[in-house]
Amino acid sequence: MCVVQLLLSAAAFAQTQVTGHVADVRGEDIIGANVTVKGTSNGTITDIDGNFTINVDDKNATLAISFIGYKTKEMKIGEKAHLQIVLEEDMETLDEVVVVGYGTQTKKSLTGAISDVKSDALTRSVSTTTAGALSGKIAGVSTRAVDARPGRGINLEIRNMGSPLFVIDGIPYGGMNSRDWLQASDVSGSDVFNALNIEDIESITVLKDASAAIYGLRASNGVVLVTTKKGKKNDKVSINVNGYYGWQNLTRFPELANAGQYVRGLAEAAQNRGEDPSKLYSPEELAKWEAGTEPGYKSYDYYDMVMRKNVPQYHINANVTGGSEKTNYYLSVAHTGQDAMMPDFKYERTNLQLNIDTKITDRFTIGAQISGKYEKSEDVGLPGGDGYYSAILAMFKMQPIESPYANDNPEYINNVHENGYNPAAFSRDIAGYKDNLTRNANINAYAQYDFSFGLTAKATFSYNYTNSRFDGYQYAYHIYTYDKEKDTYNGTPAAGRWRSQIDRSVPARYMQLQLNYAKQIKNHNISAVLGYEASDYDWTKKTYGTEPSTDYLPLLQF
């Protein structure tokens, strides 16, 4: 045994820890770059600051560093404990056309900090949100989940400066994030972006510096430009159907104390305070709690009660694309669903997208992008709190020695030391519900005329209608104590009832007139943009509430 231990120790000490930092030629941190030991499966990725740590068995090993849109770089470790790595853009991609503010450019003509991601990179992700699919794919762009609730939007920031301006098919969207829609008076750009069908996206371009200045003050935190897919000229009709069905499981979670460990911890704490632990629990009682076999000495596992295994998440998408000499089209429909690790939390979204472009003459083109969205999330209506957070906290706040049910009878919810965290009440049937429903319709129409001397005139009009509804019903369920002598259950209401509906409608209009001039004279390019924008929106919010006398009215018509 001693020999084996010595050998294992020697092997452990032979490993070398290598740290490093990965950036692009502008000094921008690259998040999510792959760092692997060449010829092995040993690897890691860079963090939000572009840093990485990796253990290697041989200091003469070679690291391979790669990231989308950049050349893979190899570096020998040698005696260096910290590596500074600079990745260069792949020159083969420099002739690609990139969407920028009010136009397009080739990558080699760009002077600002602009990054883009194509459709194939986005669709490798199984995220239900666009920001989630974009995570780790663009240097300087960070994403942060508000919480793990199904369908909850992910906040996106450029250089950690705050929420950017979102421009989708040329239409700008500002507004608040998805947690604040009940207070917001306009259309949330973050919501519109996160609820896009990822399969419909052709590319995402991020403007990080002065390149965003053309959008004015609203772009002070950067700009995210989204271009959706279109049909191609003389392209045959193509029908595509794809999707996935998966199961979600927690990969890591703190191990919770059982009843025996909890009781022993209390006894040891009393002893450390100079008190007599036997006054709290006798040795016989402690042994019974640790055995957990006798009535009244059961251990309760609140992790198993709150968390579920193999929770489904799915997505299905169907699209038709094609084009003739004059008309190109793209049509898609998609449905996404996700359940939470906790029961009775659910999210569903259906997307519809139609893009069509028609050349009326050789110089005159008209087109439209029409989209619709139906989105619904279901939560538990826990009194006095958030059912999702309360369910997570319940695993830590509930004591493993107290039963969720009075006398272990599942017909009676126990009156525990903190009733707001008893998971026995965390269901829509007992505590009620809080549902959010969003319906959105959007149409963008444009007309464009190309003059013969390099001038292009374009007019765009957009109409967006968003209706959001909150529907909540909190039940006054009872909590009970058990009288062992009388064999009776004594109940009291956990909280008062309430019934509420909030309806918010936002019709928004946007118009853009634009003149573009582009001319190439030998090796020189001349370009100019003249534009005019106008936008307005209406906001209507209706709030209804009452205190029902019973839990058994399924709906009150307001």
Name what the model sees in each region.
Residues 183-184, 444-449, 463-465:
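Alpha-helical support elements that line or immediately flank enzyme active sites
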Residues 230, 323-326, 358-362, 449-455, ...:
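Outer-membrane beta-barrel strand-turn architecture
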Residues 5, 188, 304, 315, ...:
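Short coil/turn segments at secondary-structure junctions
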Residues 2-353, 358, 365-367, 371, ...:
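Short, small/polar-rich motifs associated with maturation and membrane association
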Residues 168, 179, 233-299, 340-347, ...:
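Surface-exposed loop/interface segments of Gram-negative outer-membrane beta-barrel transport/assembly proteins
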